[in-house]
């Protein structure tokens, strides 16, 4: 199969990069990024131009654009830059991809300048997300990263993005795309609000506490539907239907209940499961080879799931840039390396 041959070549090249780069350094903290006299990232090496078959693209409201939303923060910035780079490298029409970056207010100017220095011709807007929007709704989680306000920004895309943007692909920062993103964009949602790869054989009960399942007023929310697990790091969202149905308020309602009753442990995921599980347009699993970051505690190494691959996702506690810099990489981290634009000699 072509995808196997392609991945074998990519894997070999990436392993060579790791072996030949012994001086990998840890990604700098926010203070270092703000005070650095030289660029933290290299400029993207390629000029990304549309092919002849691509439609002309203009401003954010142009109907021919593919809209992609990603959060930006200094802790995961290296991952976000790699994700954007991967999308551009594999897009047939890279100039037709419009990026919507969500960042906390005090970092937007810094991050906007940085993105423009790496991708000078990139079409994007950056949006302020006020942490106060969700701070009073967030409860403690199994991993501190899951408690960060920006992790909840995906619930507010319908409010943050321009009203003319009626559909968006939401992507986490710890992934790379190895296929044309337009294929994911064209996914039919039918009557559904969101589309995502579903995993109906997963143990759904573990995502909620025993107290949740013992209370009919909570567990009854799944009556009449077949709930399946889905990972919220890769979603196609119909923003027009989301706005019309007030789905942000529905998610906030469950977050308020969680603050009082403690019905789950996993950050921003369970409210999405409560609102949408059983009502998700299924997308091929090739678009979210998730779990490559291991579990939420140890971050152990994982293998690829069987089948073709269009997107690699390091969900879990282990991130490829951290493991690479600490010289304790997992084998599959080599597949992330070709998209990394961080200046290792910095």
Curated annotation (Swiss-Prot):
Pfam families recorded: Glyco_transf_8
Subcellular location: Golgi apparatus membrane
Protein topology in the membrane: Single-pass type II membrane protein
GO term, biological process aspect, one: pectin biosynthetic process
EC number: 2.4.1.-
SUPFAM superfamilies: Nucleotide-diphospho-sugar transferases
Pathway field: Glycan metabolism; pectin biosynthesis
GO molecular function: polygalacturonate 4-alpha-galacturonosyltransferase activity
Sorted UniProt keywords: Cell wall biogenesis/degradation, Glycoprotein, Glycosyltransferase, Golgi apparatus, Membrane, Signal-anchor, Transferase, Transmembrane, Transmembrane helix
Residues spanning the membrane: 1-21
Residues in compartment: Lumenal: 22-346
Keyword Transmembrane helix (UniProt): yes
Glycosylation sites: 203
The protein's role, per its UniProt record: May be involved in pectin and/or xylans biosynthesis in cell walls.
PANTHER family (alphabetical): GALACTURONOSYLTRANSFERASE-LIKE 6-RELATED (PTHR13778:SF68), GLYCOSYLTRANSFERASE 8 DOMAIN-CONTAINING PROTEIN (PTHR13778)
Similarity annotation: Belongs to the glycosyltransferase 8 family.
Protein name listed in UniProt: Probable galacturonosyltransferase-like 6
Organism: Arabidopsis thaliana
Taxon lineage: Eukaryota, Viridiplantae, Streptophyta, Embryophyta, Tracheophyta
């Amino acid at each position: 199969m072509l995808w196997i041959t392609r991945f074998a070549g990519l894997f070999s090249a990436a392993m060579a990069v790791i072996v030949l780069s012994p001086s990998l350094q840890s990604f700098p903290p926010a203070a270092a990024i703000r005070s650095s006299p030289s660029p933290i990232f290299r400029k993207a090496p390629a000029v990304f131009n549309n092919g002849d078959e691509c439609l002309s693209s203009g401003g954010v409201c142009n109907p021919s654009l593919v809209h992609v939303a990603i959060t930006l923060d200094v802790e995961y910035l290296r991952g976000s830059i790699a994700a954007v780079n991967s999308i551009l490298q594999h897009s047939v029409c890279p100039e037709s991809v419009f990026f919507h970056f969500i960042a906390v207010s005090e970092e937007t100017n810094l991050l906007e300048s940085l993105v423009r220095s790496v991708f000078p011709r990139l079409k994007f807007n950056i949006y302020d997300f006020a942490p106060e929007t969700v701070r009073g709704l967030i409860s403690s989680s199994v991993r501190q990263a899951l408690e960060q306000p920006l992790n909840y920004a995906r619930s507010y895309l319908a409010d943050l993005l321009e009203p003319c943007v009626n559909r968006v692909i939401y992507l986490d920062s710890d992934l790379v795309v190895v296929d044309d993103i337009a294929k994911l964009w064209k996914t039919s949602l039918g009557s559904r609000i969101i589309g995502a790869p579903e995993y109906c054989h997963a143990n759904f009960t573990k995502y909620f506490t025993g107290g949740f399942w013992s209370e009919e007023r909570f567990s009854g929310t799944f009556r009449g539907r077949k709930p399946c697990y889905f990972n919220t790091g890769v979603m196609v969202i119909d923003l027009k239907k989301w706005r019309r149905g007030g789905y942000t308020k529905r998610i906030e309602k469950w977050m308020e209940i969680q603050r009082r009753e403690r019905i789950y442990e996993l950050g921003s995921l369970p409210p999405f499961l409560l609102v949408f599980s059983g009502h998700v347009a299924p997308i091929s699993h090739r678009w979210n080879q998730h779990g490559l970051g291991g579990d939420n505690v140890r971050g152990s190494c994982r293998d690829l799931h069987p089948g073709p691959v269009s997107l690699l996702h390091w969900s879990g506690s282990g991130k490829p840039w951290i493991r690479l810099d600490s010289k304790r990489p997992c084998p599959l981290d080599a597949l992330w390396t070709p998209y990394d634009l961080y200046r290792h000699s910095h």
